[in-house]
Amino acid sequence: MTSYNPASPDFPFTLGIEEEYQVVDPQTRELRSYITQILDRGRMILREQIKPELHQSMVEVGTQPCRTIQEARAEVVRLRGTIAGLARQHGLTIISAGTHPISSWMSQEITPFERYKGVVEEMQQLALQLLIFGMHVHVGMPDDEVAIELMNVARYFLPHILALSTSSPFWMGRNTGFKSYRSALFSNFPRTGIPPSFHSAAEFQNYVKLLIKTNCIDDAKKIYWDLRPHPYFGTLEFRVCDAATRVDECIALAALMQALVVKLHLMFSENTTFRVYRRAVIMENKWRAQRWGLDGKLIDFGKRAEVEAKALMHELVAFVDEVVDELGSRHEVEYLLNVADGGSSADRQLAVFRETNDLHAVVDNLIVETLEGVPVYQG
């Protein structure tokens, strides 16, 4: 029998969080292509927990596997503080948001590694302009079959999670009209968006083998869906979120994803289930989430009606209520009620711009919010 208690040695639903940060010059407020200069020192401190990305103005970090949301918070705070400290030694800082409000992709340098040269060779301008930043959350799985079963039903909630995470309303100095322009940009890549459903782990593996055999991909990591079984970690990886600006938002979203997986697994164990919806209808909600975020309406396909997104976020928090106490994440999950009612990072960025008519002020506020409650590494 699967344990839902994180203290149990048999608890499978561990957490891992990956964040992609922007490297920024606090004077000009522009992105700086500087990751290679801080990477060596960063690896001495963080080892495999720091990685470069395609653009040199981005740095990726990843937590160790965590059993509780409190462990995950400590890891995220440590990683943000370390990267911010390394950047500060070079007169720079970091931002966590889905896009940079003013910088252009045309001014960015590509990281000179063979992997990234291959990406640019294949994707051409699509790769060069993919100056976006996300947060990925890994939830451990008991086995491959369970991962597919849970992916099939958890897909329904991806637009809800996206709406809560939106942090990319600006792009190259323009108000895009989207709450998550990052999602719109990423949709230009192949094998992105809401995943299809699969009848079994074997069917999914046959799909992967077909793509590899026909030279579509050379590795299952090039399946970039919003939710996927990770090919090496034994996790279900949520990839739908914009980068979370505040640590509190990052941790609340991760807690929700863990609780959602546990709730759905509990339903399976009690011989109840959640309907598997077609990708086409979930995509309708994803469009609404990336366009209007929490200010719009999503479709409740059970009721066959539009419902205010904010109301559905309250329903989602209530849906996972029976598991959050055992997981020890009630406080973190219920923080999302504040986000639902008060707005996401995208809403706050837009509010700053309305007040100041100055995107530099938006950048300044993002710098402050990214490091709220984060001791900056002084080594």
Curated annotation (Swiss-Prot):
Keyword flag DNA damage: no
Enzyme kind, highest EC tier: ligase
Molecular function GO terms recorded: ATP binding; glutamate-cysteine ligase activity
GO biological process: modified amino acid biosynthetic process
Catalytic activity: L-cysteine + L-glutamate + ATP = gamma-L-glutamyl-L-cysteine + ADP + phosphate + H(+)
EC numbers: 6.3.2.2
Keywords: ATP-binding, Ligase, Nucleotide-binding
PANTHER family for this protein: GLUTAMATE--CYSTEINE LIGASE 2-RELATED
Family: Belongs to the glutamate--cysteine ligase type 2 family. YbdK subfamily.
Described purpose of this protein according to its UniProt entry: ATP-dependent carboxylate-amine ligase which exhibits weak glutamate--cysteine ligase activity.
Protein name: Putative glutamate--cysteine ligase 2
Lineage: Bacteria, Bacillati, Chloroflexota, Chloroflexia, Chloroflexales
